[in-house]
Amino acid sequence: MDAKALWQRYQEWLYFHEGLGLYLDVSRMRFDDAFVKSLLPKFDKAFADMAELEKGAIANPDENRMVGHYWLRNPDLAPTPEIAQEIVQTLEQIEAFAEKIQTGAIHPPKANRFTDIISIGIGGSALGPQFVAEALAPEFPPLKIHFIDNTDPAGIDRILTHLRNHLASTLVLVISKSGGTPEPRNGMIEVKKAYAGQNLDFAQYAVAITSTGSNLDKVAQSEGWLATFPMYDWVGGRTSEMSSVGLVPAALQGIDVRAMLEGAKEMDDATRVPEVKNNPAALLALSWYYSGNGKGEKDMVVLPYKDSLLLFSRYLQQLVMESLGKEKDLDGNTVYQGIAVYGNKGSTDQHAYVQQLREGVPNFFATLIEVLEDRHGASPEIDPGVTSGDYLSGFLLGTRQALYENQRDSITVTIPQVNARTVGALVALYERTVGLYASLVNINAYHQPGVEAGKKAAAVILDLQTKVVGLLQKEKTALSLEQIAEKIGAADQVEAIYKILRHLQANQRGVVFQGNLGQPSSLKISLS
């Protein structure tokens, strides 16, 4: 296609949201009108499905749940007055709590005010808050946030060591729907011990964000924690940024949460339009379907050309892959759906993997995120008439052109600046896109059976560890791996037993290996 035809195609397929100043350009996705027409019946169904979802239909049939994250930014849509009232009241409580913390009206026993936050959570309880903190927190926030988002002891130590002289002024958020998810539970226990080690009463520093009646809720109530905010069963982790999960840490950092909600609401309104060309989420879903033939055959590479949006690709990775990565469709057919997502930031990636994107395996489509405003205020010239921001813009446009010239598709999303409204809009845009795409390919976007399977498998390993250690505590002689497996009735788990024992031995847990470490079957194992 020559330059004139490309310009015409750009104008034909350009979407612009005047209120948000957001542009969506899908002109470099090479679908034709016949392809779009062929998908219109699927889109009619997707729009209808989404309308029913917003009315409170059971959109997550596997767990028999409503899906209501859209109600969070427009409570009037909620299916009952009780849900609407709870959403409104919770937001007011979050804002009031954040103000009291920031002003010192609520303060720790040994300091005039809180200065830091430890946020403990995993998955959607971490990725959304991390992305928003990186994108929107002021340079000098009223409270500086630190995340524990894993059960890695060294990672936990790193945070606690950094804050060892500030624990007495550090607020702790524990974010877990059930309170039983291992990663946040483990993090909470370790942090509790750190506070106890400094003779600090953990309850006077702790806030729970959890389901009403959960184990965590019961602990918070019985111990008298500072506050508890709700998580709803109709909001999944990966779509929870506009709930207490995201709003509490954001408000504490001084981020305008109402502006974020307003941006999301404006985007929700735009993505309700039942016309593909006039609905930005539908245009994205169309592009995803085209690129991967409706089967996820190509990866999505996300390149935000703005440092503050660095974590957007990680946020989208969970939102897209956990929602769309499914073995079965809604009819029970085996389909192996999903879209792999990865990325970092531009122009850094042009010195990393864009070489492969331009000339290597064409197994992807790119999503370029453009921010029109370079910085607040004027920029100095680097060259005559040229700023560093001009270079960044040039790199984005150059990458887009270079990819297209080599038959590699791309989408460009443009926002005027990074602020609470535009970040809220971006989150809402991709939440809706995932929902529409899921309807196009007939899958449940709102459950995660693979994650649950992984949790169960981990529990089996820990149970096996308990049996192995219990046996070795009773045995007076060293045993081989095969003997251990046989004695605990796990003859088919020799490899797992070996790896369990190797980990225990490396962490000074009393396990003694005798024999050739390079030949596991030769080892004799005992406890010291």
From Swiss-Prot:
This is Glucose-6-phosphate isomerase. One of its GO terms (cellular component) is cytosol. It is found in: Cytoplasm. GO terms for biological process: gluconeogenesis; glucose 6-phosphate metabolic process; glycolytic process. Its EC number is 5.3.1.9. PANTHER family: GLUCOSE-6-PHOSPHATE ISOMERASE. Pathway: Carbohydrate biosynthesis; gluconeogenesis; Carbohydrate degradation; glycolysis; D-glyceraldehyde 3-phosphate and glycerone phosphate from D-glucose: step 2/4. It catalyses: alpha-D-glucose 6-phosphate = beta-D-fructose 6-phosphate. The gene is pgi. Keywords: Cytoplasm, Gluconeogenesis, Glycolysis, Isomerase. The keyword Isomerase applies. It is an enzyme of class 5 (isomerase). The keyword Isomerase applies. InterPro entries: G6P_Isomerase, Phosphoglucose_isomerase_CS, SIS_dom_sf, SIS_PGI_1, SIS_PGI_2. GO terms for molecular function: carbohydrate derivative binding; glucose-6-phosphate isomerase activity; monosaccharide binding. It comes from the Bacteria. Belongs to the GPI family. Catalyzes the reversible isomerization of glucose-6-phosphate to fructose-6-phosphate. It comes from Nostoc sp. (strain PCC 7120 / SAG 25.82 / UTEX 2576). The active site is at 322 (proton donor), 351, 455.
